[in-house]
Regions:
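Conserved beta-strand/loop subsegment of P-loop NTPase cores
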Residues: 160-167
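Redox-cofactor binding/interface segments in oxidoreductases and associated redox assembly factors
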Residues: 19, 141-142, 163
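Short active-site-proximal "capping" loops at secondary-structure junctions
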Residues: 51-53, 78-79
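Conserved beta-strand segments that form the floor/walls of ligand-binding pockets within enzyme
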Residues: 46, 87, 162
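ATP-dependent carboxylate-amine ligase catalytic core
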Residues: 26, 30-40, 66-156, 168-182
Length: 182
């Protein structure tokens, strides 16, 4: 299978595991993480905000790598390939590793038939499972939509939380004021 076929297979597998965005908050994500052995215990820097999350995350990842740390960088969205969302020491993991992670998620979902995950929830569970196995010194994790129900809030050991400038985006989901959004 060539590179493009592999990433197409990863995307198809991910889509086969997801439902329309789950309204369960983190309840289903917590169940999946519990079955996975809680793959969210790695040391992390958690980044939220409206503007500048990706740039801030990339800069922090670069500084950590320059200082000799093994890093993971998890961002969204991707431009051309899902693998862009997770870099280990600045490099994409192979599609085969993502397929392994998604197979593990599939096994868990078969054990928990009541659980439905949205796309970002399943992707985050797979990414955290991969990060845990890569034994990084630090992970830089960018929120998705953000807010209290974001799947990246499953992090157990944030070393630092960073909030970049906030705007009034996604008010229907996150709140009607900057303090509610934050």
């Amino acid at each position: 299978m060539d590179r493009f076929e592999c990433w197409d297979a990863v995307e198809k597998r991910l889509n086969s595991l997801t439902s329309p965005e789950s309204l369960s908050g983190l309840v289903f994500v917590e169940k999946v993480f519990e079955e996975l052995g809680d793959p969210s215990r790695f040391p992390a820097i958690h980044i939220a905000g409206t503007n500048g999350k990706g740039s801030t995350a990339a800069c922090l990842d670069s500084m950590l790598r320059a200082a000799g740390y093994k890093t993971a960088l998890y961002t969204s969205p991707h431009l051309t390939c899902l693998g862009e969302r997770l870099l280990i020491d600045g490099q994409m993991l192979g599609g085969e590793k993502w397929l392994d992670a998604l197979e593990r998620i599939s096994v868990v979902l078969k054990k928990l038939p009541e659980v439905r995950l949205g796309y970002f929830q399943a992707l985050t569970a797979a990414a955290f499972w991969l990060i845990e196995r890569e034994k990084v010194d630090a992970a830089v994790i960018e929120t998705g939509l953000g807010g209290r129900l974001d799947a990246t809030n499953m992090l157990r050991r944030p070393l630092l939380s960073v909030i970049t400038p906030l705007g009034m985006d996604h008010m229907h989901l996150l709140g009607n004021s900057l303090s509610e959004i934050a």
